[in-house]
A protein has these predicted regions:
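Membrane-interface coil-to-helix junctions
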Residues: 22-113, 120, 132-155, 269-345, ...
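Hydrophobic alpha-helical transmembrane segments
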Residues: 99-113, 338-354, 409-418, 518-527
Length: 834
């Protein structure tokens, strides 16, 4: 009986936590359990990116490892490649599929944070509160709505990885090593290197903190031993993902992330992403206040002004009814934002309490890493620091959207709160000290909210100057377009611009003030609960329940501003459907041609790839040379370059705005023979020559590829003779051509050249190939009637998969050994006489 009670008592908090997390997640995403779907931009884009890959996999069981569907063709390593040897991901990683997404995202994020807190020594009841704060933080809802799936899974696994590092350096070294290897394997396998990178920086801060403590306490030997175990766990975790890491690393050199061979372009430099491109999405220093007050900066880019607010009242006087709903309430500096990274006012209050109460060794590394990540997130708004990070942090210049660094702050702030709650739970804080700390934490956080609610307009102009300038210019253009010169002469454009700008600033200030009062209320509720506990009016269980309720009351209503039940649609509505233009193009059975869709942003949209081989696409790591081609020619619809890419159709807006297919009869075809060779002395000259050369007759090649055509010339008789080459079979990773040529000839293939994995064959025998026309493939072909084949397979595949498999098996065996050891230890504790 006593044994049963003990088991129930031990399992009760775990059961309660899981039930709370499931109910909170399932209730929020209830429509998914009715079969409805949340439309997510990046999910739709991904379906287009991977369409020809998944089609081939379904039809043949073969993984192509290459897509021909977008940007003319590119490796699939950063899109969708099957790695059978990733058995940690394919076994333990399948646990997250017990619940469907999107509810699974929140449930497992909260569960992972809760489990990490257990490792950190936090009581399981206490851990529910910071786990709710982590899983319900608004940024999660923003990325779920956008469809950033890999990012979300990386944020699910990251706390578990941090827990493993904590256990390795502070607890059972071997169990910690096994846990770190397992969870880091899952984290890396989530395939979002930027999130993993940020959390490795956080882990480094913890490691440095532990090293300093070991030096002071004179136990460096033990510290280095634990460090070795942690490093070994990291090596195994990387090894269990060796295949994707290897191919991603080798592929990255050819992408925008590896830099351009040209002088710096708009997005790439010769070493990586340009600083301007990488920092385009930088969090504003002032904007950081929306971590505490959600609508401080006007919410999201799509938020407009109220139809019955101050802006509408001003514009209605000018006869511009409805115009207020077209003007942006957001006044930050980011080019686009889906909303604030709101952490929760109550969460920040608890973090402040943690700073006041937690022991130094436990808190200062967390505070330090939070400050570091906030500074990194500021990007171009603190350029000297960002340049320092670009120069000193290895690999940092490969990432864009530096504001993403706030994900670590989102994790660290609830952790600080957990440290405070744990000291309260254990009764370690004298009442007077607790009340002083409570007053300080509430005074700092609540006082800031109160100050902004009462006098925010004294500190900020809420975008008044920028809005006034923007509206003055718009009114000027309106008057000029309607030949209203008298209005311009009277300065009405400036007068109306000032009035509208003032109204926009005033309405934004009202939004901020409303949320400042709201945040103050949440802080007072949380502080009130802690005060009641300090005065012994409630016990620790009631305090935990009260704070959990405050977390939900604080975060869920803000989350609902971005995703609610109304956002869900039927599964049928979510399907990508072919337009009449798509159907007309698909009726053309000529293999291998491409489509350039001008009814969408062609280089930021992959839906075209759902039905066609697209000139455009959607990807953050395009091949660097193709990005150069976009910057120099494709953005300007250069016909010669579109022809060499075998662009047979344009999709353009037709009558009534409906997409219409337009045939381009000038496309070069899937392959063609050239008469002459133009040799370029540099990559810059290569791309320049594309705009100066008849690419139907001449191939542009680099100086280093000159030996491939050495001694070849096409005689007048050769060029006058009938030469034919045609694509007869196409799959993403296999192309077959039949050709006839009376003499040795050079053929250019309208397929993207990639130096790793593609092999060319003539009549079954391997044959040399080289790059032509900056991005395409070319071959020197023998006279006669022959067959050319191109086959793609990732180089070194067998060896890479072997490393992945062995590392994965070692991790799983280590995890199993740790579990067996733990069970035996528990048996000894319960039965010491055995």
């Amino acid at each position: 009986m006593d044994f049963s009670k003990t088991i129930i008592r031990r399992l009760a908090p775990a059961a309660a936590a899981l039930v709370v997390f499931f109910v909170v997640s399932a209730a929020y995403f209830a429509p998914q359990f009715r079969g409805e779907v949340l439309p997510q931009h990046d999910v739709v884009q991904y379906e287009g990116m991977a369409k020809d890959i998944s089609d081939m996999r379904a039809a043949t069981g073969e993984d192509p490892q290459w897509t021909g569907g977008m940007f003319g063709g590119m490796p699939a390593f950063l899109i969708n490649v099957a790695y059978p040897a990733q058995i940690v991901k394919r076994t333990v990683g399948q646990v997250v599929k017990l619940i469907d997404t999107p509810a699974a995202f929140l449930f497992f994020a909260m569960t992972a944070m809760w489990l990490m807190l257990l490792v950190f020594g936090v009581d399981p009841w206490v851990g529910i509160v910071p786990a709710l704060a982590y899983g319900r933080s608004t940024y999660f809802l923003l990325i779920i709505g956008a469809g950033h799936i890999t990012k979300m899974w990386a944020l699910v696994y990251a706390p578990l990885m941090m827990g493993g590092a904590w256990m390795t350096l502070r607890g059972n070294m071997w169990a910690g090593g096994a846990l770190t290897a397992l969870t880091a394997s899952l984290e890396i396998g989530a395939n979002h290197p930027q999130i993993t990178y940020y959390f490795l920086l956080a882990m480094s801060a913890f490691w440095i903190s532990e090293g300093i403590a070991a030096f002071r306490e004179k136990h460096l030997g033990d510290f280095w031993k634990r460090t070795a175990v942690l490093a070994a766990a990291g090596i195994l975790a990387a090894g269990s993902n060796f295949s994707p890491l290897w191919y991603t690393a080798s592929h990255s050199k050819e992408t925008m992330r590896g830099g351009s061979e040209l002088a710096s372009t708009s997005e790439t430099s010769q070493d990586g992403l340009t600083l301007d491109y990488a920092t385009a999405w930088s969090y504003g220093r002032t904007e950081s206040l929306n971590l505490l007050i959600p609508d401080f900066m006007g919410r999201e880019s799509a938020t407009t002004f109220s139809p019955d607010g101050e802006v509408a009242a001003v514009l209605n006087e000018y006869g511009l009814r409805g115009a207020a709903q077209q003007l942006p309430a957001y006044w930050g500096s980011q080019p686009y934002t889906g909303g604030p990274t709101y952490l929760g006012a109550a969460t920040i209050f608890l973090a402040a309490l943690g700073i006041a109460l937690a022991r130094g060794r436990n808190k200062w590394w967390i505070v330090a890493v939070s400050v570091l990540m906030l500074l990194l997130a500021w990007g171009r708004n603190l350029m000297w620091f960002t340049e320092l990070a670009f120069d000193l942090l290895p690999g940092y210049n490969k990432f864009r959207t530096v504001s993403m660094a706030l994900v670590v702050v989102q994790w660290a702030v609830p952790l600080l709160g957990a440290l405070a709650l744990m000291r309260l739970w254990r009764g370690e804080i004298p009442r007077q000290r607790l009340l002083r700390a409570l007053a300080w934490a509430a005074g700092v956080t609540g006082g800031l909210c109160l100050l902004l609610a009462v006098a925010g307009s004294a500190f900020f102009d809420f975008g008044r100057a920028e809005s006034t300038g923007m509206m003055t210019e718009q009114f000027r253009q309106l008057f000029e377009a309607n030949n209203m010169q008298d209005y311009l002469q009277r300065g009405m454009d400036a007068e109306m611009g000032i009035a509208t700008g003032n109204a926009m600033a005033a309405e934004r200030a009202s939004m901020m003030q409303a949320d400042a009062w709201r945040s103050l209320l949440m802080i007072l509720l949380a502080a009130g609960g802690v005060a009641l506990f300090a005065l012994r009016r409630i016990n620790k269980y009631v305090l935990t329940a009260l704070l959990a309720a405050v977390m939900l009351l604080d975060l869920v209503p803000v989350d609902l501003r971005f995703i609610s039940h109304d956002n869900f649609i039927s599964a049928r509505q979510h399907q990508v459907t072919a337009t009449a233009a798509d159907k007309a193009i698909m009726a053309d059975k000529e293999p291998g041609f491409r489509v350039f869709n001008l009814t969408v942003s062609p280089f930021q949209d992959a839906t075209t790839s759902y039905f066609h081989r697209s000139v455009g696409g959607y990807h953050g790591a395009k091949l660097a040379r193709y990005q150069d081609l976009i910057d120099r020619y494709l953005s300007y619809r250069n016909d010669a370059v579109l022809d060499m890419l075998n662009t047979r159709y344009l999709i353009v807006p037709g009558d009534g705005g409906q997409p219409e297919a337009v045939l381009r009869p000038t496309a070069n075809g899937a392959a063609w023979f050239v008469d002459t060779i133009a040799v370029a002395g540099s990559p810059q000259q290569e791309i320049d020559l594309l705009g100066e050369t008849d690419l139907k007759r001449t191939a542009v090649i680099a100086e280093k590829d000159k030996p491939y055509t050495q001694g070849w010339t096409a005689s007048p008789a050769d060029t006058a003779a009938v030469r034919t080459i045609a694509l007869t079979e196409y799959r993403p990773n296999y192309l077959k051509y039949e050709y006839t040529a009376p003499a040795e000839s050079v053929a250019v293939f309208s397929e993207i050249f990639y130096p790793y994995g593609w092999t060319a064959y003539v009549d079954g025998a391997e044959a040399p190939c080289f790059r032509a026309d900056y991005v395409l493939r070319a071959m020197r072909l023998p006279a006669g009637q022959h067959t050319v084949e191109w086959k793609f397979r990732a180089p070194g595949w067998t060896a890479a998969e072997a490393v992945t498999l062995v590392s994965s098996l070692v991790i799983l065996l280590g995890a199993a050994a740790a579990i067996v050891y733990w069970i035996r230890q528990k048996r000894k504790e319960n039965n010491p006489d055995e």
